[in-house]
Swiss-Prot record:
Protein family per UniProt: Belongs to the Fre/LuxG FAD/NAD(P) flavoprotein oxidoreductase family.
EC number of the protein: 1.5.1.-
Keywords: FAD, Flavoprotein, Luminescence, Oxidoreductase
Residues that hold pyridine according to the record: G115, G116, T117, G118, F119
GO biological process, one term: bioluminescence
Phylogenetic classification of the source organism: Bacteria, Pseudomonadati, Pseudomonadota, Gammaproteobacteria, Vibrionales
CDD domains: flavin_oxioreductase
Stretches assigned to the FAD-binding FR-type domain: 1-103
Top EC category: oxidoreductase
SUPFAM superfamilies, per database record: Ferredoxin reductase-like, C-terminal NADP-linked domain, Riboflavin synthase domain-like
Domain of life, source organism: Bacteria
GO MF entry, a single one: oxidoreductase activity
Alphabetical list of InterPro entries matching this protein: Cbr1-like_FAD-bd_dom, FAD-bd_FR_type, FNR_nucleotide-bd, MRET, OxRdtase_FAD/NAD-bd, Riboflavin_synthase-like_b-brl
Protein's UniProt name: NAD(P)H-flavin reductase
């Protein structure tokens, strides 16, 4: 459904990533794990995961947009948002979209995997689980090129300390000055679990990462395709 929004704030997070708060002219009903599209033109709709959870957004929608210099696709959206914030103009979105929302009727443990700004997808799901006091085991693996990309690392470490059923594992590719897990986030998951058969797996990142996860987890770790969720799976 097309909805006009005001841009309430734009906050730089780290590594060319911005937290953007939108205030829609009417409430948007969505599920944790869904996404919206920013309408840049009649045939130009650009998808971004909703980072806020349905039960906490208080009418606002939070986005985390990574707009590195080489990424004009996202950078143009951020510039459009900045212009709307300065002028008080509207941003047109279309929402909600996606079938990779949290399956709340499942009793299985949850594995949340994010690559880079794919974190916004799993953040919505994690925040929803906390606010709804869902107590089943939740494992969150977040991979980035370096520690700078993991802009919510301190927040997630605090959450994991406060909730014994939540485990947070950051993984970076560049190990200089880093004492945690290094390398590929999918390899880190495979090293930590003998089997993924009894897990609901939610994943967000580049299409090639999602495809590799589906292939490797089902063939090597007994994961079930029907228990793998991610927007990429609708396209690959």
């Amino acid at each position: 459904m097309p909805i006009n929004c005001k841009v309430k704030s734009i906050e730089p997070l780290a590594c060319n990533t911005f937290r953007i708060l939108l205030h829609p002219e009417q409430p948007v009903a969505f599920k944790a794990g869904q996404y919206l599209t920013v309408v840049m033109g009649e045939k130009d709709k650009r998808p971004f995961s909703i980072a806020s959870s349905p039960c906490r957004h208080e009418g606002e929608i939070e986005l985390h947009i990574g707009a590195a210099e080489h990424n004009a696709y996202a950078g143009e959206v951020v510039e459009s948002m900045k212009s709307a914030l300065e002028t008080g103009g509207d941003i047109l979105i279309d929402a909600p979209h996606g079938e990779a929302w949290i399956r709340e009727d499942s009793d299985r443990s949850m594995l949340l995997i994010a690559g880079g700004t794919g974190f916004s997808y799993v953040r919505s799901i994690l925040d929803h689980c906390i606010s709804q006091q869902i107590q089943k085991p939740i494992y969150l693996y977040w991979g980035g090129r370096d520690e700078c990309q993991l802009y919510a690392k301190a927040e997630l470490e605090s959450i994991a300390q406060a909730h014994s059923h939540i485990t947070f594992v950051p993984v970076v590719e560049k190990s200089e000055g880093w004492t945690g897990k290094t390398g590929n986030v999918l390899e880190a998951v495979k090293a930590d679990f003998n089997s993924l058969a009894d897990m609901d797996i939610y994943i967000a990142g580049r299409f090639e990462m999602a495809g590799a996860a589906r292939e490797q987890f089902t063939t090597e770790k007994q994961a079930k395709k029907e228990q793998l969720f991610g927007d990429a799976f609708a396209f690959i």
